[in-house]
Every structure is written in structure tokens, then in C-alpha cells.
Amino acid sequence: MSSEDELGSIGTVFPGSPIDKSIGSILPQFDEEVETLLEDSFTWNIPDWNELTNPKYNSPRFRIGDFEWDILLFPQGNHNKGVAVYLEPHPEEKLDETTGEMVPVDPDWYCCAQFAIGISRPGNGDTINLINKSHHRFNALDTDWGFANLIDLNNLKHPSKGRPLSFLNEGTLNITAYVRILKDPTGVLWHNFLNYDSKKVTGYVGFRNQGATCYLNSLLQSYFFTKYFRKLVYEIPTEHESPNNSVPLALQRAFYQLQVSDIPLDTLELTRSFGWDTAESFTQHDVQELNRILMDRLENNMKGTPVEGKLNEIFVGKMKSYIKCINVDYESARVEDFWDLQLNVKNFKNLQESFDNYIEMELMNGENQYAAQDYGLQDAQKGVIFESFPPVLHLQLKRFEYDFNYDQMVKVNDKYEFPETIDLSPFVDKDVLKKTLDSENKDKNPYVYNLHGVLVHSGDISTGHYYTLIKPGVEDQWYRFDDERVWRVTKKQVFQENFGCDRLPDEKVRTMTRGEYQNYIIQRHTSAYMLVYIRQEQEEDLLRPVLESDVPKHVITRVREEIKERETKEKEIREAHLYVTLRLHSIKEFIHYEGFDYFAHDGFRLFAEELNDSGLQQINLKVLRTTKLSDIFASIKETMNIPQERDVKYWKMDYRRNSTLRLTQPINFESVNITLQEALKKEKKRTMQTQYGEEGVASTEEDDKALLETVSFLDLFIEEPYLELQFLNKLKEASLISKAQLDDELISTIRTNLPELTKGGIEPVFATDNKSNLLFVKSYDPHTQKLLGFGHFAVNQLQQLSDISAIIEDSISSNEKLTFYEEVQPGTINEIYMKETIYDADIDTGDIVSFEVPGAVLPDTFPVYATIKDFYSYLRYRVKLKFSKFDGSSEEYGVSNEIPESFEFWISAYAPYDDLARMVSKYAHVKPEYLKIIALYSNGRFVLKSTSLLNDYLLKDFNCDQIPPFAFEVLSVPLKELERLRPIKLYWLKNSYIHYQCFEFEVANDYTESQFLEKVQHKIGFTDEEKENILLWTNTNFQFQGLLSDQNTFKDVSKHSLLFGRILPEESKLFKELNRLENVQTSSLEDFMDDENATDRPMDDEQDLGMAIEHSEDMKGRIVVVQQYFKDLENRHGISFLFNLIPDETFPKTKDRLHAKFGLGQKEFSKIKLSIGYSTEEGTVFRSLQGFSDEELDKVILYDIMSNLDYIYMDHPDRLRSHSSYDRPMIIKN
């Protein structure tokens, strides 16, 4: 509460409390890590409640610790019906000599306190009392805290049930404050982080979160404080590189900015250097994946430099994988490097147990004996052991695992402890350990590691937040780096709060309070997922401070310049309200401008700077609002090279409703000795009077302040009457000048020699707003293909348009009559009837009229715009296309030749494909009909059709920033011929039904299977012998559809089908036998491909087909369909394929063959539930093959049960289902 609200104190205060309760019994113990500095209480006795008529009262002050405390009372409530009571501390104050007011000695004062406020009845305090408790961080912004509704007024004044007496004893009342002042161990206890300055409080800054990359922020902070690593990064040569495509330079800059910046940084530059687009920046990736890719990229950049191999020295350890025979002296071992370790969390209590599990030996005996060289099958022990750990050890805790029951990734939230210090020697090879810990080094243990980084995830698998806890040096002080903010934390916040939490029984959860439940949920979902340990004996070396001299000079120079530029810009923003920017325009700028309006401006999106051939632009003049108009006008003339003695007029410009920037009215000031601010106020007053009458609207200080904030720039046109076209024509007629067409030379001549030119009585005339109009004229020359400003006219409203035409015809020495058009706005160009007057044609001051230069010879170029209307259309819809040579072709019709890698040009968005191809051919030096053009959007590539318009492949309401890059490919056949071919994607399966390669081809619709295989053989790489054993089949909606053979063509293959191919000797042989069977129409098998509704057919159709080609004596097997699904037969996924059944083969052997062809690992395949669907005379039978003993399954022979095209079903989760089209693999491209 401010001091001006205080009404003086009433009553008295005394130490202690009339309520027989200790502070400890009232205020709960907050935290064992938070020290209590002081606790005390005081009581305010109010002598007569009934005399409290004012809204607010203060108690006398009572000193506790370094503060004087008082109680604020709102007896009638603070915007409510209850009594409001607050507690307020007052820090030590001093006199501010500037303002004469008392101010805190420490402006950043704060006090963390637990407190309670109690009311009690004097004389009966032990029995009649009410106490509420809270806690708060008191500071200069939050000076008081308490209870807005401590007690209802009626309850205060009258007895209630269970309380025979009121709180008032003959009007008196006691209000007691209990205060416990706590030591703030971190500097942020109960902090709301408003106006929090991380750099000021901790000396460190964080990163802004640009999307889903807070895991990147955490990893960068961890690397930044691995100071030896930071020095290595600084030693990579980057002087001649760009941060946009150099990961080392971007990392150097990020690290140095973390050293010197006072504000949080963003990671945009770094992610750009990775080659990531916006989508990748907003995609959740795995921190371990990023860690390894980043290290690999840096390692490559360090090759050939003094720091080559240094990353291995600090981050790479060695482990030995071994198989050791028990009964013979034989061991097979392999030593491998590791950058980090993935440790299991589930079912383990702590880090020690995870390491024990990591090196746990597996016994190989029985059927799993090891085939030892020279010794045959032997019992053996299999495992891994460590030979060395790196100085900086990254441990990835497997908090995220795939759960087959839920068919998705889940987070392991169980409690898992990690120590501050760990001895890893128990996990090291004994022979290595003996050599390391010899007698000379027994005092030093290189396997003792101290924790320095904890990367934390709070949330579940789909949502959450990442932050990191870091101990920057050897000092025992931890900090939390949470995106933009950094603050100190306690040991408990580092360890216990990030262990996770075991799931509690539902019965216990149901008994929790709301606050307890929230804390339980937070604790359970907040856990460490990565730990960074540093070898104890190398801590000082690895964490030695990084000096300015360690940073490359070019990084220091550039970053310092950027900081200075940012500070300058921030200063400009702070002082912007003191200035107005005058954007000055003249006829000289107009005659050089090609485009809509007079010249380019901020509100105009159809202009590109590169189209401004002359380079002339508006002139910006930044002036203080306190500058006198006389000085401003002098500066304008000086800036624009106009002699000071020339008489000019200043026109205000503004945007019309159609967004065109045009002249509005001349600026007329009674005096030039007033300031710009005063002139703006007068202008505002005139405007208000025009809108609201003579009395206008009273101007207030708030209005003036709003004016200061809103009027930051003014567009002004400087009318020079001596450059008006009628005046120029008179000078030409008087032979005072040789031409009347404006150019830079003529403008300069007239400005300089005007007194000499007007001696004969020819005087320039200003356009006045009520008698004449100021019109602007443009000319279009078809020969030069340019539409430029021609000049301006000061014309009477009753003047004929034909008079203007005659003057222009004379200026350009033409005998042909001109046709004029009014440029209303982009897309609206109206022809003007020349017999009308200016008034009748509805042409007003600031309007633009255009004409076409008659008799011009069209140039021998392409494209050509023959008329002014054609050119206006081009201006309205022109776009700049950037082309590159297409390098992603997967088809055989592309040819390579020496053509430019990239080029760019302007063209109309409504250009037909033939015109676009013709433009590309000029740069690619090939015939346009042999070009294929591709629009490259982030979500796909789109090949332009030969019958299309360019606009068909642009976004609706596009602007220049939304034009995609384009690519071109030179074809060996004309595009129109190629378009008659059909695109086909072949998913080629090599060794399994899990992984495939996708190939794209263009084929004719009449292609058969053999023709197609002949076409693709070279690209895929199979032999002639293998070609005979290839099966091609289609799937639709994950269901088998049919086989492709020479009896049908690709015309019969549905566009919605997926085409698969694999070398399958057994299945291919059976299929050929089926084709040879008498009285069997092979086409019936392929009918599945012809029917686009095949996926909707019931199983009986396929069974009928199978029975139609039932086994005969010539058959040596059967073909069945394998279908994948999860839980429900309709929930299909994966590839549906054919599989052969062998006579007399038992089910376990059939299952082994299916496993080998399917391709999953033994562990994963064992989780698949198999069942069959087969046809009988009674109908289709579905039978599960689960729950049978091995002896029972040995008696099952599928060949005897199933017919051709019956089904084997595989019930298992779809491992790719959760991978959307946006889940792209992580890659650093630069």
C-alpha cells in the first residue's frame, strides 16, 4: 500500500500473543534446507471497533529483524464483504536528495517470511480466536500480503454455533501477527520472476525456447559448462565461414554470447546451421540422438586441425564385449568405443544397480551353447566389461520405453536414485584395474566421478518440459537452467526432486489433499533422463575458467558489434517518441520508379528493390519534435538538393481505402516559427473540428501523449511548380529549354537556373486544393518494356483531358492521339474518355493517369507486353522464381549436361506453362519442350503439368515470401510424351517384410510384369536368375490385393494400391505351378487387382478363389496370405504378403520359416500372436494358435488344414503407427 493511502495508526501494539500457542505450533516447518533467521510475534489492540469509519487503518509498527512491520486493516472489506487484513514490512529508508522523498536504502530489498494473522477476543484469547497462515516474498513490488476475507463481519461481531462469545469485547479486538523470517538459500524462494534478471542474480543467462527444442537448450548449457570442451570448440578454424551453415562457428558464437550477453539467447542461428527448417525446430527429438550427431559433426570439423581427436580424449570410453568358455581356455572379445551409456531404469532402484545390470553375465548352456573355435559347443559366459571411462561421462537413463501392451512409447516414472559421487572401479576389467591402481597410484582413483549435470524432463511422453541442473565449477553450488531463466537451487532440488516417484496405491492416493496430490503428480512425472559425471581427479583441469583470450578474435569482434547494434536499436526504440521520421518524396523519384503508385512504400507488397533500376528511393529525415518548422523546411531543401530560395509546396500523403498512397492536402502553417509538435497538435485540432464541428474536442494531456506515440512518421511530397509539365512546355515553346521531358539533367538545370528562365514572364503556378488538381502522369514504352513516371500537371478541374494529351503529344513529338488510363489500384486500370473534363472524369488531386507511347517497335525479346494493359497485368502478378538444377530424380528419363546450377527471373504468375518453360530454356540452354519443372514445397515436390498455369502451383493470395523454390530437369523425351506415362512406386523388399527401398518409375499403362522387371532391373540390381523368382503384388489398406503377371498390365493396377516386390523362389515356383494347372483361369487370381473395392470384399470371396485352384497331385505346396493386425482384425497394418506351406511340415518349423522371412529379431517375433483363418464346407473358421503346448503344436500341419489363399494372422503392434509424416529423422545437414 502506498504511503499516501495511510490514515495514521490507531491503538497500540505489544510484543507476543494473547493466544497460548507457540509460533512453531502455528507455522509448519517449511524445509530442512531453509534456515530460520528469526521469528517473533506482536499484537495490535484496537480499542473500539465501532469507531472505525475509514476504509483503511494501519497498526503502529513493530520491529522484527531488519524490518519494521505493521498490520493493514480494511474493517469494511477490501472490495468484498469480509474483513481484510494484511501484513507489511518496511525496510530501512533514506532521504532521496533529488525528490526529497524517503526511499529504501536497498531498492532491491526483499524478505521471505512465513506468517500467520490471528484475531482474538481480549481476555478470552485462548478460547475465542481465529488464525490464518501463509507465506510470501515481500519486496518493493509486493509490499504487503495477507487475507482479503479473513472473517465475515457478522461472524466478527456476533456469537456463532460453537462460539458463545463474539470476537469483540466491548468493542475491543486483538489482531496478532506471527512472523518467521527465512534465509533464502537460492535467491528465488517464492519468487514470481517478474522483472527477474538472471545475469544480475546468478551471472549466467539462458536460452529462449524456439519450439520443441528445450532439450537442445539443456544440452548446450551442459556443454557450455564443460569448459575444456568449450575451449576445444573455440580452437576450430572458422574465420571464413558463415554461422548459417557452419555448426562450429554457430556454436562458438553461442558459447561466447553466453559468456558476455546480459539477456537470454535464441538458438535460431544454431538450428539454421544444422540445416533445420521450422518444422524440424518444432519437432521433439531425442537428446541422445542430437548429442551423437553433434559430436560426429564437430569431430569431422576438427580433422586436420590442432584439436583433431581431442573430443575422443574427453568423451570416449572403451568397453569389452566377451564370450568366455567355462570349461576350456578360450575367450572371444571385442573392444569398442562408446560416447555415452544407456542404462536401464525400470525395475532398478539406483545407478549402482543399473551398472550391475549392464555388466551382468549371461550363461550360455544347454541348447544355447557357444560354438568355440577348435573346441566345438561349450558352456560359456557372455557379457560386457569396461576397460576405461572418459573424463566426462554422459549417462542416458532409459526413461522412455516401448510398451507392447499399450502399443506406444511410455515414460518410466519410477523412483530412481543417483549419487553425487560414484566409484566406477567395480565395473572395470580386473586386469585393467590392477594396472591402473598400482602401488604408485593407490592414492588416486581415476574411477571416482562427481556429478555436474542433471538433464530433467517434466511431463509425460507426449507433452512436457526440459531443463537442466548444472554445477558450473568445483564449488558446491548448483543452478537450474530453465530456458530464459537461471537460478540457484538446493541439493534437495537437484537430487530428491528429480529421482521420480514410485506409484502409490490407489487407496493412499484417494486420501490425499488436493495439494498433496498435485505434489505427488509433479514428483512422479519429474525425473532425470541424462546425467553428466566428471572424473574427480580432472575436475580442476576440465572446469578451468575460459578466458577472453581463448575465444577467436573474429567471434569477439562480430558478437561485440551485434551487441552494440542491438543496444543502439533499443536506445532508438526508447527515444522513438521524441522523433518523427519525415519520408520525403519528389518528382525526381517518381520519374525513375516502375510500379504501382508514385514510388515504393511500406504498405506496398508488389515492389522489389532490385526492380528499381535507378536506385533512387525515398529520403528519410529524422527530426526532433521540438524542431522549428523553419529549420525542418531548410533541412528538407538541403537534403533534396533544392536551392533554399526556391518556392515549394509540401503535401501530406496518406493511404486511401484501397491501400494506395496518394496526396491528400497541402500543408499550410500560419507560422514557421512553431515546433513540429505544436504543428501536429494544431493539425489534429483542425481535423477534430472538421469531424465534430467548430467546438471540436478538448485536447488533454492523454491525447497529446497518445499523439506522441502514434505519429512516428509523415509522408510528404514536395511539389516543385517549376517542374510542372505545362510550365516546361511553355519554356520549350519559348526555346528556353530544348526538351520538355523530365530527366535528372533537366531537373538540375531548372532548379539552378530558374531566375534566368522566368525573366520573360513565364511563371510556374502551384496547384491549389480548391481550384485546380495536381495529377501525376506515367508513360509506357513498349519498345523498352518500361512503365515510368512522366511528370505532373497542375490542371483546372474544367480543363479538357484532350488539352493534357496535346501537351504530352508535343513533349514526345508525336502526331498520334493518345489513349489515357487511370491507375486506380493494382488490378484496376480504367480507360479514360478523352472528351471529358477533369471534373467529369472524376479525377482528383493525387490521381495517376497513364498513356502508351505510340508507334513503338516491339523488342525481339521474351516475354513481350505489347500494350500498357498487358504490362499493368504483369506488374500486378509478377513473381520472382528461383530455379536450381533438380538432383532428386529417380527416373531414367532425366539427362545430364552442362547447364547452370541456379538462376532466377521475373514472370507473371498467370503465365502458361509453355511461357514458363520458354523462360527457363533461355537459362538452361535446352529446348523448352524437353524441360520438366518442379515446385519444391516443404511438404512435397509438385511437377508442373504442360497444360497448367504457374499460378496453379502457388499458394492462394501469395506474396513474395511465399513463392516456393523451383527446380528444372532436362528430359530425354518431350514432357508431353512423358506425361502420358504413369508414375509407379515400387516398394522393394530385400531380406524382410520390415524394411524396404522405395523406387519411383514412369511406365506405360500397357506394361506387363516382364516388361516392368526388365525396366527396373538395372536400378534395383537383381540378376537374370533372380528375376525369374520375383513376385510383384499389391496391397490396399494393408490388405493383400493380388499378383501381377504377364496376363495383365499396369492399367489394371489401382491407383490406390501399393506395389511390392521381392525375390521369393518357393512362392514364385508355386505360383507358376498354379498357372499351369488345367481348367484354372489365372486371371481369376489377378481379378483382385482390377477391383478397386477389393479391400471391402468379405473373406469368403478369397476363399472361393482359393478353392477354385484347390490342390492337385502336381502341387508341392500351397500359397496362403499373411495378414498383420493389432488386437482387432480390422486394425490392419504392415505389409500383407504370400507365404508357402510345405507338405508334412510341422507348425514350429513353419513358424521358424515365417520368422526368417518376416525379419524381426527372436525376442520381438516371440511376442507375435499367430492364428489362422481357413475355409471349410461350413464356412470360414478362425483359430488361434496360442495357448498350446509344444507337443500339441508339433502335431499341427498347416498344409493339411489350409487351402490356397487362406490366411495366417499376425497379431502385434504397428511399430510405425505412431510415426507421422512429420516425424523426420534428426539430421544436421551442414
Swiss-Prot record:
Q: Name one GO cellular component term.
A: nucleus
Q: What SMART domains is this protein classified in?
A: MATH
What's a Pfam family in this record?
Answer: UCH
A GO term, aspect molecular function: cysteine-type deubiquitinase activity
> Which ranges carry the USP domain?
205-536
- Domain of life the protein comes from: Eukaryota
Q: Which InterPro entries match?
A: MATH/TRAF_dom, Papain-like_cys_pep_sf, Peptidase_C19, Peptidase_C19_UCH, TRAF-like, USP7_ICP0-binding_dom, USP_C, USP_CS
Q: What class of enzyme is it?
A: hydrolase
Q: Which reaction does it catalyse?
A: Thiol-dependent hydrolysis of ester, thioester, amide, peptide and isopeptide bonds formed by the C-terminal Gly of ubiquitin (a 76-residue protein attached to proteins as an intracellular targeting signal)
Domain spans labelled MATH:
39-179
Q: Which UniProt keywords apply?
A: Cytoplasm, Hydrolase, Peroxisome, Protease, Thiol protease, Ubl conjugation pathway
Q: What is its EC number?
A: 3.4.19.12
Q: Where in the cell is it found?
A: Cytoplasm, Cytosol; Peroxisome
Name its GO BP terms in alphabetical order: free ubiquitin chain depolymerization; poly(A)+ mRNA export from nucleus; protein deubiquitination; proteolysis; regulation of protein stability
List the active-site residues.
Answer: 214 (nucleophile), 465 (proton acceptor)
Phenotype upon gene inactivation:
Cells show oxidative stress-related import deficiencies and growth defect on oleic acid. Peroxisomes are clustered. Cells display defects in peroxisomal import of proteins containing a C-terminal PTS1-type tripeptide peroxisomal targeting signal (SKL-type).
Member of which family? Belongs to the peptidase C19 family.
Q: What else is known?
A: Present with 2810 molecules/cell in log phase SD medium.
Protein purpose: Deubiquitinase involved in peroxisome import by mediating deubiquitination of the peroxisomal import receptor PEX5. Catalyzes deubiquitination of both monoubiquitiated and polyubiquitinated forms of PEX5 following its retrotranslocation into the cytosol, resetting PEX5 for a subsequent import cycle.
Question: What is the name of the protein in this document?
Answer: Ubiquitin carboxyl-terminal hydrolase 15
